[in-house]
Structures are given as structure tokens and as C-alpha cells.
Amino acid sequence: MELRVGNRYRLGRKIGSGSFGDIYLGTDIAAGEEVAIKLECVKTKHPQLHIESKIYKMMQGGVGIPTIRWCGAEGDYNVMVMELLGPSLEDLFNFCSRKFSLKTVLLLADQMISRIEYIHSKNFIHRDVKPDNFLMGLGKKGNLVYIIDFGLAKKYRDARTHQHIPYRENKNLTGTARYASINTHLGIEQSRRDDLESLGYVLMYFNLGSLPWQGLKAATKRQKYERISEKKMSTPIEVLCKGYPSEFATYLNFCRSLRFDDKPDYSYLRQLFRNLFHRQGFSYDYVFDWNMLKFGASRAADDAERERRDREERLRHSRNPATRGLPSTASGRLRGTQEVAPPTPLTPTSHTANTSPRPVSGMERERKVSMRLHRGAPVNVSSSDLTGRQDTSRMSTSQIPGRVASSGLQSVVHR
């Protein structure tokens, strides 16, 4: 039986879960486009979707904020229909064998700081900054980082007067313990500084592959949170960031130095990483690690196909009496064809690749996420699209490789 929402959207299979409610793949019947549909049972103890949809509506129009198509109730469910996005940064991190290159981390950091700044400019803090809540766009927006899931977001100041919420203590931990700020662990009311500190841990997670406080065991959730808190507080920032550019330690030290109601200097933090990016000689071509892996696997498959055709060609030579005694170049001329050159190993020159992708492992990874592959998304998001302002130093048309960077993995979804 076909399930419909709002008399316009067809409900499909479940594709994920958010902080409150489940997410389904849907279809806009009139437009023929795929959408994401978030459902929440109306009988739930603490209904949240209506509040979340209001926050999304307040955020509409911002760069990297998903478009809301429809909100309402349908039968026993509260419903929110949203723009369908691509994979989360956590999905892509796994796709890239749980390690991002410095170039990819810096490209992401620039956009992620801007997303958090935009939310703060709208008088809200996110309170659950983690890789799962940042998604890449699809198609022409395949290089744009989106921020999602406002189920735990909170207003931190009055929209008219900008009066900040009061300082409080003895608060329960809200968010994800792995990325929570130290003040959040200590029970202090969250503010702008905490979103940015969480982002610092996310960036080091991308650098390191894991954080020192991951994998700790405890009998209860509360005890586990305490162990994470202890490990986080006893790990100096310089130790956490050892072996990586000093900008990461500078970023975290800056965030931890902020007072409760301070307005962070977002431009300073962005510039920290932009200066590092330029010193490293990287190019703002928006080719991320996952683009290189996808392209590398594709190139390897092409090489294998050429090699197969070459073998068949040689086999035909050996069976053809007219060409059997001729050298391969001469036999090629006799048939009016050129000899196929042997395949050359793939040697990526971009800073984004940590190692040369092997054909088998690349294709194996691609197969595991085959549901998410989005073929042929061109790299055509300009830097002004990403930051909301024009910056002519960042990218020129000549830097954009044709169709090298497909957005990697398709339509996973809002969590």
C-alpha cells in the first residue's frame, strides 16, 4: 500500500535516525524529486519535531542549511519534509579508511566554522556538533557542507535585545560525550564557546582517526561519561595535537579561553586554518579525499579493462596467420590500428590522497557504500557559495578538474 504525506509526498524506506524521530526516503510526487521525511510519533513523551522544524524555518536561506519543504501532522505522526542530502562526514570518514588528509580537514574546517557562526547569528547554539550532523550536498552542491539536526539546539540570547541566557551549573550532559566540551562535562550551561570547542575535537578526530577518550569501558552510562571527562581533562591540548600543525592547538586553546557569554572571533579561527592551507601550498579546488578515492577506483577499473582488451588483441594476433610472424607494431599497422599502451600505475599528485589507492581496496570500499554513490557531480561550488562572501583569491575556473570529483557517496540522509 502506498503511504502518502501531505498529499504530495510518497513515503519510502527508512534511511536513518535523528536525535528525535526516524528519517525516511520520500518522493515529491509533483516534482518527481527525492526528499527526506522525518517522522515523530505524536504520542511520544517529549514531542520535539515541531520545535525543530521551527528552528529550521528560522535558519532558512543560510548557506549549508537544508531546505524545509513541508511540516505538519499526518495520522499518528508529526512530519517534516526536507531537502535530501548526501553522506555525512562520518560516512565519508569510514569510506576513507578513517583518516582524512590535512587538505581535506582544512577544507572542511573552513565551512564548518561558517555553519556554526551562522547558527549563532540566528540566536541559537547547536549543542550536538559531531561528524554525523554534517552532510555533503548532492549534485551541483556536492562540495557544500550542510549542518543538520536541531533536536538539541537551544536559544542562547534574546533575538531583539541580544540579552544572553544566564550562567548555570549542575546541568546534565546534552549532546555526544565524545565531542562535548570540558565545561559541558562539568555541568555548566552551554554557550557559543562549547559548539566551537566540540568542533576542535571533531577536527582532531579527523586528523588522528580516533580520540584518546574513545573506547573507554564502564558499568553505566554515567560512569562512562565520567571516565571520558577525566581522560579529556587530563590530556593536554599540546599532547592531543602533537604531530599536527600548531593551528589545531591554537584553535582549541582559544575556544577554552572564552568566557561564558563571549562572542567568538570566527574570522580569526577561519583565518588560522586558511593561512595554514596557503602555507601548505594547497589549492581551493574542492577535491576532497573521497573524490580521489572514487576517481582512483574508476581509473583502476579503466586500466584493468584496457589490459583485458590488450590481452585479447594479442591472442587474436597469435591466431591470425597473416600477422603471426610480424612484430606487434607491424601487425598493428597491418590492421590499421595502434598498439594499446600497457596500463600505467595510478599516481595521484593531489595533496588529498594519503596513499595511492589500490584497485581492489578502492572498489571494495565503493561497493560497501554503493547505495550512496552519486556519479559525476562536477566541482562547481564557488568559494563565495561556501562562505557567503566573495573571495577571489580562493579559486579560479582553471583550477577546477572536469568531472574528477563526484560527490562520492549518494543519498544517505539526515540523521
Swiss-Prot record:
It is an enzyme of class 2 (transferase). It is found in: Cytoplasm; Nucleus; Cytoplasm, Cytoskeleton, Microtubule organizing center, Centrosome; Cytoplasm, Perinuclear region. Its EC number is 2.7.11.1, 2.7.11.26. PROSITE patterns: PROTEIN_KINASE_ATP, PROTEIN_KINASE_DOM, PROTEIN_KINASE_ST. Residues 278-364 are annotated as: Centrosomal localization signal (CLS). One of its GO terms (cellular component) is cytoplasm. The active site is at D128. One of its GO terms (biological process) is positive regulation of proteasomal ubiquitin-dependent protein catabolic process. Residues 9-277 form the Protein kinase domain. It catalyses: L-seryl-[protein] + ATP = O-phospho-L-seryl-[protein] + ADP + H(+); L-threonyl-[protein] + ATP = O-phospho-L-threonyl-[protein] + ADP + H(+); L-seryl-[tau protein] + ATP = O-phospho-L-seryl-[tau protein] + ADP + H(+); L-threonyl-[tau protein] + ATP = O-phospho-L-threonyl-[tau protein] + ADP + H(+). Essential serine/threonine-protein kinase that regulates diverse cellular growth and survival processes including Wnt signaling, DNA repair and circadian rhythms. It can phosphorylate a large number of proteins. Casein kinases are operationally defined by their preferential utilization of acidic proteins such as caseins as substrates. Phosphorylates connexin-43/GJA1, MAP1A, SNAPIN, MAPT/TAU, TOP2A, DCK, HIF1A, EIF6, p53/TP53, DVL2, DVL3, ESR1, AIB1/NCOA3, DNMT1, PKD2, YAP1, PER1 and PER2. Central component of the circadian clock. This is Casein kinase I isoform delta. It comes from Rattus norvegicus. The lineage of its organism: Eukaryota, Metazoa, Chordata, Craniata, Vertebrata.
